[in-house]
């Protein structure tokens, strides 16, 4: 979602053979619908340039002459060095303006808007641990698409919620209109995880006649429409996503500073208001208790962040375009948390079903839009598919090919 984890996926065994099988060189050029790929949380690179008045450790760089990769750079996640990274990647929330700011002397930018490189591999070294949308893009290329032309990427600053990314949506709309003109037809949006929430926000803010003209379809992969309980654990005690060299408490402050985390807390239109997500020796917390939850974890800014973002997407307002929802099932997915010591110790996790990150009932919110829009809404379960692995899954890629090129 957006995944709230480091993106880690590997090429499937026999993946190259599968790509060759999908290749369709006979498909007439120019008749493919253009494609825009939208990543999830932590799903594209970020770059930073420094001119800081001070640093948190003597090993940290105070000034850089050029932009460098802030995410994902595996070298920056090493012990001690990670303190430098946390200090640079965090956001500072302003209670007066209800916006976030970069730390003093840190400038962060999103590289590669319109290209796919920053989301194919999150680590510019192209290490397998940072592979994200590479297999999907390679599949598109094998079907006749060309990077940076009729398949483009729309990366964004995933630390922020849509209300702080206004210029991004203007650039996205302009790019879609340009691709329509260049390639003679409407665009197919393909989003993953939190990128689906971004696209829902975008589409809810476009006139219907614009959507009818410029958007052919919206393919939503692992969509967290109703929010995910995992965010409560991230906010309370941090989440190292099973990376042993990183302590959860070490990165908790940085994870809390990302407003997009509070945006993805569970919503009442999907989850029962009585469902207990967090149990502690002193209190239990449902989605009606967020204000108290933030107070008890010592993060009062979180309540303001939630109030700022809770109404950004309207659950009862469908996207207004042809929609394909693909979601993982059968993978143990965090649903509630028991703390013996709250909030500074890891909890016992209780699991439901989903894709390991997005719970099934959150993804299935797609179903409620049937009958609320004239455009068709299709749902496709992906049994046993994990949140990231689904992006390279043969079923997913075959489904996408049918959407783009037909039977």
Swiss-Prot record:
Location(s) in or outside the cell: Lysosome; Secreted; Membrane
GO BP terms in the entry: ceramide metabolic process; diacylglycerol biosynthetic process; fatty acid metabolic process; glycerophospholipid metabolic process; phosphatidylcholine catabolic process; phosphatidylcholine metabolic process; phosphatidylethanolamine catabolic process; phosphatidylglycerol metabolic process
EC numbers on record: 2.3.1.-, 3.1.1.32, 3.1.1.4, 3.1.1.5
Binding of substrate, residues: 41, 194
InterPro entries registered for this protein in UniProt: AB_hydrolase_fold, LACT/PDAT_acylTrfase
pH behavior: Optimum pH is 4.5 for the transacylase activity.
Tissue: Detected in brain (at protein level).
Reaction equation(s) it catalyzes: a 1,2-diacyl-sn-glycero-3-phosphocholine + H2O = a 2-acyl-sn-glycero-3-phosphocholine + a fatty acid + H(+); 1-hexadecanoyl-2-(9Z-octadecenoyl)-sn-glycero-3-phosphocholine + H2O = 2-(9Z-octadecenoyl)-sn-glycero-3-phosphocholine + hexadecanoate + H(+); 1,2-di-(9Z-octadecenoyl)-sn-glycero-3-phosphocholine + H2O = 2-(9Z-octadecenoyl)-sn-glycero-3-phosphocholine + (9Z)-octadecenoate + H(+); 1-hexadecanoyl-2-glutaroyl-sn-glycero-3-phosphocholine + H2O = 2-glutaroyl-sn-glycero-3-phosphocholine + hexadecanoate + H(+)
Description of activity control: Transacylase activity is completely inhibited by Triton X-100 and partially inhibited by heparin. Moderately activated by Mg(2+) and Ca(2+).
Residues the record marks as carrying a glycan: 94, 284, 393
Disulfide bonds: 60-84
Residues noted as binding Zn(2+) in the record, renumbered to the chain: 193, 387
Any one GO molecular-function label of the UniProt entry: acylglycerol O-acyltransferase activity
Coiled coil stretches, renumbered: none
Major location category of this protein: other
Pfam short name (any one): LCAT
Recorded GO CC terms: extracellular space; lysosome; membrane
Family: Belongs to the AB hydrolase superfamily. Lipase family.
Record-given protein name: Lysosomal phospholipase A and acyltransferase
Taxonomic source organism: Bos taurus (Bovine)
Gene field: PLA2G15
């Amino acid at each position: 979602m957006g995944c709230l984890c480091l993106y880690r996926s590997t090429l499937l065994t026999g993946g190259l053979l599968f790509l060759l099988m999908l290749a369709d060189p006979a498909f007439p050029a120019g008749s493919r619908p253009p494609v825009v790929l939208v990543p999830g949380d932590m799903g594209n690179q970020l770059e930073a340039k420094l001119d800081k008045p001070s640093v948190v450790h003597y090993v940290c760089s105070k000034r850089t002459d050029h932009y460098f990769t802030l995410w994902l750079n595996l070298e920056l996640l090493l012990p001690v060095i990670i303190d430098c990274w946390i200090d640079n990647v965090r956001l500072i929330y302003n209670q007066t303006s209800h916006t976030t700011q970069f730390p003093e002397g840190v400038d962060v930018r999103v590289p590669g808007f319109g290209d796919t490189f920053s989301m194919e591999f999150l680590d510019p070294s192209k290490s397998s641990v940072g592979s994200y949308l590479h297999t999907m893009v390679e599949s598109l290329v094998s079907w006749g698409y060309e990077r940076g032309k009729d398949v483009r990427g729309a990366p964004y600053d995933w630390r922020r919620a849509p209300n702080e990314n206004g210029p991004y949506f203007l650039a996205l709309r302009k790019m879609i209109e340009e691709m329509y003109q260049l390639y003679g037809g409407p665009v197919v949006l393909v989003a993953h995880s939190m990128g689906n929430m971004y696209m829902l926000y975008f589409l809810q803010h476009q006139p219907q006649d614009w959507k009818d003209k410029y958007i052919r379809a919206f393919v939503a992969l692992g969509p967290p429409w109703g929010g995910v309980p995992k965010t409560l654990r991230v906010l309370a005690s941090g989440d190292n996503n099973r990376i042993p060299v990183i302590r959860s408490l070490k990165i908790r402050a940085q994870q809390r500073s990302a407003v997009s985390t509070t945006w993805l807390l569970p919503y009442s239109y999907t989850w029962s208001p009585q469902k207990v997500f967090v149990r502690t020796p002193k209190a239990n917390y449902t989605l009606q208790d967020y204000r108290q939850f933030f107070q008890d974890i010592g993060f009062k800014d979180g309540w303001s962040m939630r109030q700022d973002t809770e109404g950004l997407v309207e659950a009862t307002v469908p996207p207004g375009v042809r929609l394909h929802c693909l979601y993982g099932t059968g993978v143990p997915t965090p649903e509630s948390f028991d703390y013996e010591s709250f909030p500074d110790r890891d909890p016992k996790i209780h699991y439901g079903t989903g894709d390991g990150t997005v719970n099934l009932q959150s993804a299935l919110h797609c179903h409620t839009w049937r009958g609320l829009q004239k455009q068709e809404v299709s749902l496709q379960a992906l049994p046993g598919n994990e949140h990231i692995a689904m992006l390279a899954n043969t079923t997913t890629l075959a489904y996408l090919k049918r959407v783009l090129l037909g039977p």
